[in-house]
Amino acid sequence: MSFDFVKIFETIDLHKNDLDVDNFMTTVINHCHQMQPNKNWELFKALDYTTEVKSLATHVVNILEKEASSFSEQGFWFGLSDNGYLYFAVSDRYIADEDNLDWIFEAQTHYPEEGAFDSKILRNIEDLADETELDNYAEYPLFLAYGLKLAQASINHYKTAYPERKIGYSIGYDSGDIITGGWV
């Protein structure tokens, strides 16, 4: 069986509402293993995803308190690069359309200077992918899956801090492949 990136993307989207971060990541890793059998997938399962998600959940609110936008935030974009760099940006509008990021580019947008997440897990995924030669078979899906969980935790924390605000979010690679979190 060859590695089907479309299928793994669909798996991530299908299971995105799993509240147990470690269980979600194990589900994604198991699907990856089915398509690209390799004993080293177990190394990715050993990472402590939940602890870091909890520790980074406050990042968005903390940064926006220091680097406030000049408008009321409505849309949140969590962008990923191919090397596991995850950052966030906010805009004054949001469109919950899986194939459309115009809302982030055609609206007032704020890219906080300190918007990048300092994630050891994302760096560990990249290092393990390189060391085990799983490379993009691990990086693409696990960056996206874990980035999604960081985004969800950040949005949940934001909603706790600002329950009256209606916000939406999406996450994906700057080069494409978007998962829409929707309105919260």
Regions found by a protein language model. Give the residues of each.
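Acidic, proline/glycine-rich low-complexity IDRs
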Residues: M1-Q34, N38-F44, S69, R123-V184
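Amphipathic, interaction-prone secondary-structure segments
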Residues: T58-N100, G182-V184
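Charged, low-complexity, helix/coiled-coil-prone segments
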Residues: M1-F5, Y49, Y85
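Intrinsically disordered, low-complexity regulatory segments enriched in Ser/Thr/Pro
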Residues: L86-D135, I178-V184
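Contiguous, amphipathic alpha-helical segments that mediate oligomerization or scaffolding
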Residues: Q36-E67
